[in-house]
Swiss-Prot record:
Protein encoded by which gene: miaA
Record's catalysed reaction(s): adenosine(37) in tRNA + dimethylallyl diphosphate = N(6)-dimethylallyladenosine(37) in tRNA + diphosphate
PANTHER family named among the record's database cross-references: TRNA DIMETHYLALLYLTRANSFERASE (PTHR11088:SF60)
Residues where substrate binds: T11, A12, V13, G14, K15, T16
TM helices/strands, residue ranges: none
Task performed by this protein: Catalyzes the transfer of a dimethylallyl group onto the adenine at position 37 in tRNAs that read codons beginning with uridine, leading to the formation of N6-(dimethylallyl)adenosine (i(6)A).
Name of this protein: tRNA dimethylallyltransferase
Gene3D superfamilies: 1.10.20.140, P-loop containing nucleotide triphosphate hydrolases
């Protein structure tokens, strides 16, 4: 059986380029581990790889859903595992590339999700919020997960509902899943290589600032506007993700274009910091520094590692 490779790290660190290069070298196929790239029509703001950037490598879980369709960790876990099995059954190497920490965690340390879908759970807590108010919602979280309740302000109802949803789906406090408590990191199977990409903070932030500017220049605002014109609600989860929610602020006249750019870059930098914090908690990640021109060295190292893994697995 071919090994499974997982590539993680903060946004703008170079995961896509490495994943494609590695897939081309190893006859691999890529599974996206990104919670926004899974949606059709959300291309620029999600930094979805273009056909040229995909380099003729088959990609899975890109453009898989309509923006109005819900997508949960449980769904990702199921679809990604199906894709992994499909790829390995054909003698290819599955490579998961993404920065959505909970998605990746669900593949490495499979969570047992409740049989009922999370949409009904989310609907229940949304109705509870409407009827009882945000303070009561916050108290419900405090009963189930005191650490998350301490971390989240009562006004942050979206994240509170998310935490309550995960408590019910996994049977564990969301803070435990996030890593706020001592976590058990069991050894990885010999057929799995867990790769993390990083870079000095100033380089990551510089790349992020430049990428945000490039997204706006490439038509992020127009892409967002078109989605609204097509009838998609601005309250949809993917349209509340980084980039799209900032474009909406500008489109609705809440901020000027320079102010939109400032908070877009700031929030993306904060997001990258949270991503690094999440993945650095896991001692099983093998880290590589993606300083300029280092892709070739990382690629050669990973090809050698994978060759050794494949011989051991076989």
């Amino acid at each position: 059986m071919k090994p499974l490779i997982i590539i993680v790290g903060p946004t703008a660190v170079g995961k896509t380029a490495l994943g494609v290069a590695l897939a081309q070298a190893l006859q691999g196929e890529i599974i996206s581990g990104d919670s926004v790239q899974v949606y059709r029509k959300l291309d620029i703001g999600s930094a979805k790889p273009t056909l040229a950037e995909q380099g003729n490598v088959p990609h899975y879980l890109l453009d898989a859903l309509d923006p109005a369709e819900p997508f949960t960790v449980a769904q990702f876990q199921t679809l990604a595992n199906q894709s992994i099995q499909n790829i390995q059954s054909r003698g290819k190497v599955p490579i998961v590339v993404g920065g959505t920490g909970l998605y990746i965690r669900s593949l490495i340390d499979p969570f047992q999700f409740a049989e009922h879908g999370s949409e009904s759970i989310r609907s229940f807590w949304t109705a509870f919020l409407s009827e009882q108010g945000k303070e009561a919602l916050h108290r419900e979280l405090a009963k189930r997960d005191p650490l998350s309740a301490q971390r989240l302000h009562p006004n942050d109802t979206v994240r509170i509902i998310r935490a309550l949803e995960m408590c019910q789906l996994t049977g564990k406090p969301f803070s435990e899943i996030r890593g706020n408590q001592d976590m058990n990191y069991p050894p990885l199977p010999p057929s799995l290589l867990y790769v993390g990409l990083t870079a000095p903070r100033e380089i990551i932030y510089e790349r992020i600032n430049r990428r945000c500017e490039q997204m706006v220049a490439a038509g992020l605002i127009e892409e967002t506007h078109n989605l609204i014109k097509e009838g998609y609600s601005p309250k949809l989860k993917p349209l509340q993700s980084i980039g799209y929610r900032h474009a909406l602020l500008y489109l609705y006249g809440k901020v000027t274009l320079p102010e939109m750019m400032r908070i877009f870059q700031r929030d993306t930098r904060h997001f990258a910091k949270r991503q690094l914090t999440w993945f650095r908690r896991d001692p099983r990640v093998v880290w590589y520094d993606t300083y300029s021109g280092n892709l070739t060295n990382i690629l050669e190292s990973l090809i050698g590692t994978c060759s050794g893994m494949e011989s051991r697995v076989e």
